[in-house]
UniProtKB/Swiss-Prot annotation:
InterPro entries: 4Fe4S_Fe-S-bd (IPR017896), 4Fe4S_Fe_S_CS (IPR017900), Ion_transpt_RnfC/RsxC (IPR010208), Nuo51_FMN-bd (IPR011538), Nuo51_FMN-bd_sf (IPR037225), RnfC_N (IPR026902), Soluble_ligand-bd (IPR019554). This is Ion-translocating oxidoreductase complex subunit C. It comes from Pectobacterium atrosepticum (strain SCRI 1043 / ATCC BAA-672). GO terms for cellular component: plasma membrane. Residues 539-548 have a biased composition (Basic and acidic residues). The keyword Ligase does not apply. GO terms for molecular function: 4 iron, 4 sulfur cluster binding; electron transfer activity; metal ion binding. Its EC number is 7.-.-.-.
Length: 693
């Protein structure tokens, strides 16, 4: 009984809720065999042609490349891209790519040389002798991605399905009304597709393999049945035509009866799905050693004179492909990449073909309905009835328009497959899929900002923790250093401080430096007085020479007369008499001398006058000489000259006797003595002036 029940369920087909039946236009392109096209003038290869980050560029401008040579490198979800032909790297710059936003992406521009030479290829004809990791790495380096639409890296997808996969589904449904790329590939390359499925079976070791195909492809069904022969490990399942039966979750439900939970992938229920085009690319990569450099693209639409399916090199500009189909750009402005339900209008015709590009639709004016104005939602619920994912399109529409991101997320916005069934049946002509795409992009941007903020916070917290650790380590080192200081170290520190204090004291004793005042006029009064005194001395010497012939020589000065006090008194008396004589004298020389020399007290340099003081001129000369010598001695003491200047006065005249006094040993004591002498001299001069008066 159980065996009979298993046989009854063996070929059973389930159905999914929702879906639509749009008019089919597949016959425009499905009846024409696959054909090769000429090489374009340049190839535009975007770095990102898959679901994941772009790879690292490994070529430079001006490099010569061969077909199949990697242009980028990457790991994990970062797939490399390869040169579609041999030629020269002409530029690496931003270029508009095949995306609904029309944004630019970094691309490599290659100018072909026309030789189309391959690089060295690595083949694994006996792939069963290789390890699974080796084959997965080879598929990754070949740049194999899902060709059914999403472009997920195949090696990463297979790596995630190594455990728990019971059913491998090969998707050949191709439910879009105009697209026939997989249909034509199954008709002409069924054997190679089956070889690719065998490689997948070797990698995954599933319990069963199901090949799903819609019943509107009779030629492809016949070709696959012929290629399968009498195989028992693979089963071909022909399903009813219904849009979108080619969706991953929908085909899983049709073939297995299992529903994929919200927010999950089919691997969560033990199912893994691959497209027939991906299976073909896997065979070419493993057995033939060819990286993914071309794919089948459908050229269809009534605006094309030669519709069909072509082998298009990745990076071929759309304009070049349309010319191969007989398309006139000046007559038809609109071109759709993809099908009429899930495709998008191209902003430019210079965008390149990428790994997920399966169709170029150039409709005529009769094929396109006039653009209808968007109306308000009437809550008819037709969109909910047509949704194959079991969502509430009306609620998602309101949440998207109201920027209610969390509510849209809670209502499973990201489970929407963007099939366009809701917009197709909407009587208000609301472009629901556009709202959903925009809302998804905004939520992804918010999530990325939140991730960056969280990462920045983690980095900030790590930095603060590191700074705290470094601070604690420094404090610990300082404490350990302070605790480990020995007595000898302290003595050395004290000795260094004592040397610094002694040096500062010595600098203070030397005195402050002489201050130089800019633009100041020098005081030459002392020099003028000295010259005048010298002239007076010369004249007096001449007079004394004449008098010395008549008078007796002067006696030597006794030691008692060398007393500084007596000398100071004598000098003061001489100055008083000199003033009086100067007032009465009419000689200009004596007046200039007495006015130029300031009244300063004499230093303790003893100049003893031993002659008679009746002559006023001699007294004035003697007083001038005493003042000059006193000024010189004072200047020498102020400038701290080490060697004192000895004062020697030669007198040949008998009335004046000059005695040289020894210089004091200590300059400070000499200065003090000089000051005392000046004070006493002033007092004595005042007393003598009072007596004379």
């Amino acid at each position: 009984m159980l065996k009979l029940f298993s046989a009854f369920r063996k070929d059973r087909i389930w159905d999914f809720d929702g879906g639509i039946h749009p008019p089919e236009m597949k016959t425009q392109s499905s009846q024409t065999p696959l054909r090769q096209i000429s090489l374009p003038e340049q190839f535009i290869i975007p770095l990102k042609q898959h679901l994941g980050p772009e790879g690292e560029i490994c070529v430079s401008v001006g490099d010569k490349v061969l077909r199949g040579q990697p242009l980028t490198r990457g790991k994990g979800r970062t797939l490399p891209v390869h040169a579609p032909t041999s030629g020269t790297v002409n530029a690496i710059r931003q270029h508009t790519t095949a995306h609904p936003s029309g944004l630019s992406e970094l691309s490599i521009i290659i100018v072909p040389d026309g030789e189309d030479r391959w690089c060295e290829r690595l083949t694994y004809r006996d792939y069963r002798a290789q390890s699974v990791d080796t084959l997965l790495a080879h598929l990754h380096q070949a740049g194999i991605a899902g060709l059914g639409g999403a472009g997920f890296p195949t090696a990463a997808k297979l790596q995630g399905g190594m455990r728990g996969i019971e059913t491998l589904i090969i998707n050949g449904a191709e439910c879009e009304p105009y697209i026939t790329a997989d249909d034509r590939l199954m008709q002409e390359c069924a054997d190679e597709i089956i070889q690719g499925v065998e490689i997948l079976s070797f990698l995954l070791q599933p319990k069963r393999i199901l090949i799903g195909i819609e019943d509107n492809k009779p030629e492809a069904i016949s070709a696959l049945r012929l290629a399968l022969g009498k195989r028992s490990d693979m089963q071909l399942r022909v399903i009813p035509t219904k849009y979108p039966s080619g969706g991953a979750k929908q085909l899983t439900k049709i073939l297995t009866g299992k529903e994929v939970p919200f927010g999950k992938h089919s691997a969560a229920i033990g199912v893994l799905m691959q497209n027939v085009g991906t299976a073909y690319a896997i065979k070419r990569a493993v057995i033939d050693g060819e990286p993914l450099t071309e794919r089948v693209v459908t050229l269809t639409g009534e605006a094309l004179r030669q519709p069909g399916n072509v082998w298009a090199r990745l990076g071929t500009p759309v304009r070049h492909l349309l010319k191969q189909g007989g398309f006139h750009v000046t007559k038809q402005p609109m071109v759709v990449m993809g099908g009429p339900l899930m495709g998008f209008t191209l902003p430019l015709l210079d965008v390149p073909i990428v790994k997920i590009s399966n169709c170029l639709l150039a409709p005529s004016h009769s094929e396109m309905e006039p653009v209808a104005e968007e109306q308000s939602c009437i809550r008819c619920s037709k969109c909910a009835d047509a949704c194959p994912a079991g969502l509430l399109p009306q609620q998602l529409y309101w949440f998207s328009r109201g920027q209610e991101h969390e509510k849209a997320r809670d209502h499973h916005l990201f489970d929407c497959i963007e099939c366009g069934a809701c917009a197709y049946v909407c009587p208000s002509n609301i472009p629901l899929v556009q709202y959903y795409r925009q809302e998804k992009a905004e939520i992804r941007a918010i999530d990325e900002d939140a991730q960056r903020a969280a990462l920045a916070k983690v980095r900030f917290d790590a930095k603060q923790a590191r700074l705290e650790r470094e601070k604690a380590a420094r404090e610990l080192r300082h404490k350990q250093a302070a605790a480990g200081v020995s007595t000898s170290d302290k003595d050395a520190v004290q000795a260094a401080l004592e040397r610094v204090r002694r040096k500062q004291t010595a600098e203070a004793e030397i005195g402050s430096p002489i201050t130089v005042i800019p633009d100041a006029q020098p005081d030459n009064s002392a020099a003028i007085a000295a010259r005048a005194a010298h002239k007076a001395l010369v004249r007096e010497e001449r007079v004394r020479e004449k008098q010395s012939q008549q008078e007796t020589p002067a006696t030597e000065v006794t030691p008692e007369e060398l007393d500084p006090r007596k000398a100071a008194v004598a000098a003061a008396l001489a100055r008083v008499k000199a003033r009086k004589a100067a007032q009465q004298s009419e000689l200009n020389t004596t007046e200039s001398v007495s006015s130029a020399i300031p009244d300063t007290a004499a230093e303790p340099i003893a100049v003893v006058e031993a002659q008679e003081q009746e002559d006023p001129r001699k007294a004035a000369v003697a007083a001038a000489i005493a003042r000059v010598k006193a000024r010189k001695a004072a200047q020498q003491l102020v400038t701290n000259v080490e060697a004192a200047v000895p004062v020697v006065t030669e007198t040949t005249a008998e009335p004046i006797a000059v005695v040289e006094v020894q210089e004091p040993e200590d300059p400070r004591k000499a200065a003090v003595a000089a000051a005392i002498a000046r004070v006493k001299a002033r007092k004595a001069a005042q007393a003598s002036s009072y007596q004379e008066e």
